Amino acid sequence: MLKFQEESLRQSVNGALALRHQINPFLDAIFEKGITNVCFLGIGGTYASAMQTVSHMKEFTSMEVFAENAAEYITTGNRRIMDGTLLIYSSVTGSTPEIVKAVEKAHAAHATILAFLDNPNPHLRELCELCISYPQNEQLKLFMVADRILFLRHEFDCYDDCYENFDCYLADALISVEQSLDSFAQEFAKK
C-alpha cells in the first residue's frame, strides 16, 4: 500500500476519540443551561460533513437541527441562529473567508460556538466558547458532538456502549477496511 501508515491512522482515530474528554463536559454544561436548536455550519466539504451529521441526528431527535451553508448565511442570514443556538463548525485552514464572516455573524447573534480547527486561527478562537485544534477526522468529531447531544436528550441510549466499542475497535476496523480495499483500488486504477 502506497503511503499507508497504519500506526499513524490508529493514533489519529484514537486521538480524535479522546477529544470527548473536552467535548462532553462542554456539551453537558451547555445542555444544562439550555439550547434551543443546533446548527452545523460549513462551506464546501465541511458543509457536506454538516449535512451528514444533521441527517444522522434527524433520525433520532425531534430537536431542531440544521446545516447552514456559510456563504448563504452571510448573504441572507438565518433568524434561527440566535441566543440559545449551539453552532458547531469545522475548518481545516481556519481562514476560509465565508467561515470567518459566518462565525463573526453567529457570534454577534449570541450563538454558542464550538469549533474544530485543524490549524488554529487566533481570531476564530476568540469567537468560540470552545475551540479544539486537532487535525483530520472531521466527521468523527462532528458525530461525537451529535451523539452526545442525543444522549443528553435520552434519544441515544446506546451511547456508552457505542463509544466503548469505538474506543476498542474503531481504529483497527478502519485500518482493516483500508487494507482490504487496496487490491480493489489497484485493479480499478489499471482500468
Regions found by a protein language model. Give the residues of each.
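N-terminal amphipathic/basic leader segments beginning at the initiator methionine
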Residues: 1-18
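Glycine-rich phosphate-binding loops that contact phosphosugars or nucleotide phosphates
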Residues: 31-167, 171
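A short, well-structured juxtamembrane/interface segment
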Residues: 15-34, 176-190
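Short, intrinsically disordered, charge-balanced linker/junction segments flanking boundaries
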Residues: 131-144, 175-191
